[in-house]
Amino acid sequence: MGSQPEYGVHAELNVPVETRDGTALATDVYRPADPDTNAPIEESKPALLDRTPYGKRGRMERHGEWYAERGYVVAIQDCRGRFDSEGEYYIFVDEPEDGYDTVEWLADRSYCDGQVGTIGTSYGAWVQSALATQDPPHLEAMFVNQGAANGREATFRHNGTFELRWLCWALTLGGGFAKRALGNSDIQTLLADVDVRDVLADGPIHRGQSPLRHIPNYEEWAFDIMTQGATSDDLWQSPGMNFERHYDGMADVPTVYAGAWYDSYTKATCDNFAALADRKNADQFLLMGPWTHGWNGYPLPSWNKPYSGELAFGEAALRDYQETRLRFFDHYLKGEDSWDDQATVEFFRMGTGDGGRTTEGRLFHGGEWSTADEWPPGDVEHTTYYAHGDGTLSTAEPDSEGGATSYEFDPKDPVPTLGGNCSSYITYEPREENLIEYPLAERNLHDITGRGGFDQRTREDTFGAEPPYGPLEHRDDVLVFRTPPLDEPVEIVGPIRVRIHAETDASDTDFTAKLIEEYPPSEGFPNGFALNLADSICRARYRGYRDEPDFVEPGEVYEFAMEPYPTANIFAAGHRIRLDISSSNFPRFDVNHNTGGPLYGDREYRVATNTVHHSATHPTRIELPVRRA
């Protein structure tokens, strides 16, 4: 149990925090106050900092008040160039120094006892790690919920490809609330009326020809992340974009890295914990639930979400987010024993459910919490499952020297995305009212891809799908390898590795891998349920996680390495483990045009013949982190 509410709240709004370059960052400060008079108390208290690009008012106000009532000073700040803060906005680049300066400013206030902790989700998690690369002297603890690690490898970009969610974000939550849009109703109206689905369907945008042309600084950073793929590009050296390069110098403070199996930052969360637990002396924790990206509760953030996409987990999945964070800070900033029983690693094991159909129409996948001393847990061993020419997947190595399967990959007919580790694939609902009658901040957002676990079959509302709708495995460009029904359960916990041996007749193409649990037909799901657990992609020119592009020679066999995001799941007896291989997953990732042209913005298209090998010489395989019984 954490601190109880015992104070009133005194708020100081739009306090300017001047950074080293003279930019004023607008900050709301919530202080514990006398409950009768609401006058701020004289006693200094530890402070919590939450930096956001989404505006510090609205739901954030109650967020600040909640902690102030429990004895914390809370500073909620608009990031540079957003809402009430001065400066030009370029995504993440200025966050390390701005965060450092704010931590030290806050620690220097008379009402702060010199200890500063940081909180925030998504962008608010990213900026925490960014400021930690600068090692502020008064930073004492961090609760990093669903944040990044290496923007080039698995956030903005992904093994050479581009995660199109950032283009969606630029057109909606980013650009819609840019300073220029907030100050010009015509620009904001134009952005509000954009149907992002049309933008995605029309193919790559071009400079000066999309709605982003009206907010040039947003167009600049959007095209930078879409077109710059090499490690040597200055963008990916920045401590605001790539924390992995700066792990050794990061602040050595107690930190919780929290995330979810269907979050867009799953791999980054686990990577941050594993790397920093090994490097730092301060306590590091990992907490992974079964949820999707973001929080699910207003006005306060919450993990009280018992489902992800078409999956239901039951009440076991519910978690009090605010109380968990409070217990952590009470321990490390107030010296209370509220965190003593917390395991170093706590995670949700999905897959203990009966597979029945819930009243909401979801599949009851179930699950339960588990703990470990390290990540991945010490009782995990990677077990290799090999693809075979007859479509089977087994631990037996291929015994033939030959064996390959070909398909045609048409970039104009990509494989549709059906859920998974998605976020920000969104568009504003169309409205007839103007922005005065119906402000942009109040408009609903439509999800384009879905997020979480989904039966891998298209339907009428699947973006990019065309009739006849049905299982993705029925497509000619999707190769499927599956085990026989399992004789006993198989539990996996940890990182996943895929190695595809393949060739193409193009100078560049993509390969994708998707791990699936196949539920057999049942009364609730007479066609079975192909549950996506994790997926990844590899752009040929960046195969092997290359730092610089290297185009392939048509007809030559290469190994394409991928790391689908970590997970924790129990494959039940009678179910099958399945590996799907293809060359696209759209719009989760941008589509390779197969021409060897520009990394983004190619105007030409080419159908590629891609061949996956599954022989003794060139074994295609997936390595699963199997937990010993």
Regions found by a protein language model. Give the residues of each.
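Cap/lid segment of the alpha/beta-hydrolase catalytic domain
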Residues: A33-D108, A154-R157, P299-A312, E473-R475, ...
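Alpha/beta-hydrolase fold nucleophile elbow
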Residues: S110-S122
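Accessory cap/linker subdomain of secreted extracellular hydrolases
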Residues: E61, E69, T133-G249, P414
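C-terminal, loop-rich substrate-recognition/catalytic regions characterized by aromatic stacking residues
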Residues: L191-D195, L200-Q209, W303-A629
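A catalytic-pocket lid/entrance helix-loop region that shapes and gates access to the active site
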Residues: I119, W126-D195, W261, K280-R327
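N-terminal cap/lid segment of alpha/beta-hydrolase-fold proteins
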Residues: M1-E43, R482, L486-E488, E548
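Active-site-adjacent alpha-helix of alpha/beta-hydrolase-fold enzymes
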Residues: K267-Q284
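Short beta-strand/loop motif that positions the catalytic acidic residue
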Residues: Y257-G259
